[in-house]
């Protein structure tokens, strides 16, 4: 039985608690918050011990794994302390706001022989695995373009719900760093790393924030393909747009909306292709989870992510999203922001 403690009692912590509760060999034993009132409320809801003393929390013999649900720019410090206390760590996206801070996290976890894992649930969808397998099998021929489109909406109230939201120091960026990062990570997971990028960002629909609510980047992948990222929280719609990935090549095209395929076509059809279209095809009227409401996501993919970490611990192997994997999207986003700041000049990743 693995015993979990959660750091931070905000919205995403509820998803962690539900995911842990659904895993047979996992138990939530503690919640830490700087506010004892929040810790008490969370502990009552999820039946775990409340803490407002971080040292007592990370040294508790009743906790094996700590999950981090603090603001993005405040992941390094609690992770460093937890690693030195011998706790394994699962950290919400993004791992941190700069690649350099992620490097510090990776180092301190390695020095203390504890596991560092990130949370990118889209990797665990069956459709994501099918897309990666098709790319690895060369079914696209020469890949021409690999694109990500995340045209979402967040209200002004969303950005005003926490003083840290929309700040460079603690949010690390805007629509690209926070909402688009899941899809950006998936693009890197299936396509490999990006060599260089040109980008522009704008603030269109929100007041009082430092970061972008619209961003566009043109990518050159190391494998020679070109691509585009469009990410926004300024795109209102009645029910929300799905997050799309589009991979197109000389022998095939796949358009994936969230975890469904709008297009799954190859010049050389396999026996499984029609079954894939039937089982994972996009149903008319389906909308993107979290596209307009950040709480409208299913905890099951966090559960799959956590189960992968527990399997890695059981078998002495790397989790699918280790510290180095979690770093990839941060390095790309840092380059995107550098390019946008420099007037769209090419930046190496």
Roles of regions detected by a PLM:
Residues 103-122, 141-148:
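Rossmann-fold dehydrogenase core element
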Residues 48-108, 301:
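Beta-loop-alpha module in the N-terminal Rossmann-like domain of NAD(P)-dependent dehydrogenases
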Residues 221, 244-324, 349:
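C-terminal glycine/acidic-rich active-site capping loop/insertion
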Residues 52, 68, 91, 116-118, ...:
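Hydrophobic residues in well-ordered beta-strands that form the structural core
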Residues 114, 141-145, 338-349:
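C-terminal capping/lid region of NAD(P)-dependent oxidoreductase domains
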Residues 122-209, 343:
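Predominantly a Rossmann-like dinucleotide-binding segment in NAD(P)-dependent oxidoreductases
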């Amino acid at each position: 039985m693995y015993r979990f403690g959660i750091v931070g009692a905000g919205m995403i912590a509820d998803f962690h608690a539900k995911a842990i509760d659904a895993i047979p060999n996992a138990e939530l034993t503690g919640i830490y918050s700087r506010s004892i009132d929040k810790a008490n409320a969370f502990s009552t809801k999820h039946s775990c011990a409340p803490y407002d003393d971080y040292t007592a929390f990370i040294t508790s013999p009743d906790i094996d794994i700590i999950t981090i649900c603090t603001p993005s720019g405040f992941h390094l410090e609690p992770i460093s302390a937890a690693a030195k206390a011998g706790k394994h760590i699962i950290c919400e996206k993004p791992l941190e706001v700069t690649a350099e801070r992620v490097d510090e996290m990776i180092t301190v976890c390695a020095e203390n022989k504890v596991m560092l894992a990130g949370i990118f649930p889209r990797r665990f969808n069956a459709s994501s695995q099918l897309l990666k397998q098709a790319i690895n099998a060369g079914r696209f021929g020469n890949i021409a373009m690999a694109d990500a489109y995340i045209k979402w909406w967040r209200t002004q109230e969303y950005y005003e719900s926490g003083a840290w939201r929309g700040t460079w120091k603690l949010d690390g960026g805007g629509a690209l760093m926070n909402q688009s990062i899941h899809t950006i990570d998936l693009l890197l997971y299936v396509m490999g790393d990006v060599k260089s990028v040109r980008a522009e960002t704008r603030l269109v629909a929100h007041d009082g924030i430092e970061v972008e609510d619209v961003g566009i980047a043109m990518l050159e992948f190391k494998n020679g393909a070109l691509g585009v990222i469009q990410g926004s929280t300024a795109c209102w719609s009645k029910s929300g747009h799905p997050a799309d990935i589009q991979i197109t090549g000389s022998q095939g095209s796949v358009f994936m909306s969230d975890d469904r395929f709008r297009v799954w076509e190859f010049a050389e059809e396999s026996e499984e292709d029609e079954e894939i279209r039937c089982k994972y095809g996009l149903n008319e009227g389906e909308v993107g989870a979290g596209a307009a409401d950040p709480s409208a996501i299913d905890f099951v993919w966090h559960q799959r992510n956590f189960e992968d970490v527990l399997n890695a611990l059981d078998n002495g192997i790397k989790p699918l999203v280790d510290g180095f994997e979690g770093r990839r999207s941060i390095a790309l986003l840092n380059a995107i922001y550098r390019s946008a700041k420099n007037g769209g000049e090419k930046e190496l990743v």
